[in-house]
Amino acid sequence: MNGPEDAKLKWEAIRWRSHEDNVRRLRQRIFKATQDGDLATDRNLQKLMLRSWSNTLVSVRQVTQRNAGRSTAGIDGEVALTSPTRMMLAVQVHSQRDSWRPLPVRRVYIPKAGNRAKLRPLGIPVIADRCHQGRVRNALEAEWEARFEPKSYGFRPGCSCQDAIQSIYVTCRGPRAKRVWALDADLATAFDRIDHSRLLEALGSFPAKDMIRDWLKAGVVEAGKGFAPTE
């Protein structure tokens, strides 16, 4: 589970069900340790996840085969759309899991949802960064899924806007719905101005905290403007 024993195999020959089961079980153990308030076990399991070859394979597959942006490159112009390049990327990512230094993201502008006349910025990391982010997410997300409020639906696995709509409907139809407020707000460039110190403080002793700090400071590269640090 913790070494690239599949490195000489063809990408198509990898036993994906086994690797996905390894990641799923480890996520469940992290979730349970967090629920039980066992921080020491939580951190040890997260370290195991971050060393896991299964986690690397599953993360690379998600980025290079399943994600809609798999053919979109970052500032290095690299993508991995063939089996050999995916296998090479997986071995590279796993070998650099403790030494990788994030690169700036490529900033482009895309139409805003619901108002295509307006554009919003989108940061595109290099493909290796996306794979490392997937690895870190599997270690971190399982912990925070146990911490989040049950009625928080944004950017969470298994949650959607339909879940939020249903919750609002049930609340408004409930016996205590005498005065109901709905706030619709658009926070301009909110993610560009997140307080890094508060975010890092919330991570506590998370094993990949230094890599997350590096991602926050990686900055952006925009056509015609060059490099700009993250605010």
Identify the role of each PLM range.
Residues 62, 91-117, 127, 131-139, ...:
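Reverse-transcriptase-like RNA-dependent polymerase core
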Residues 1-4:
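Short, charge-rich, low-complexity alpha-helical interaction segments
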Residues 147-151, 155-159, 163-231:
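Conserved polymerase palm-domain catalytic core
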Residues 82-90:
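Compact soluble domain cores
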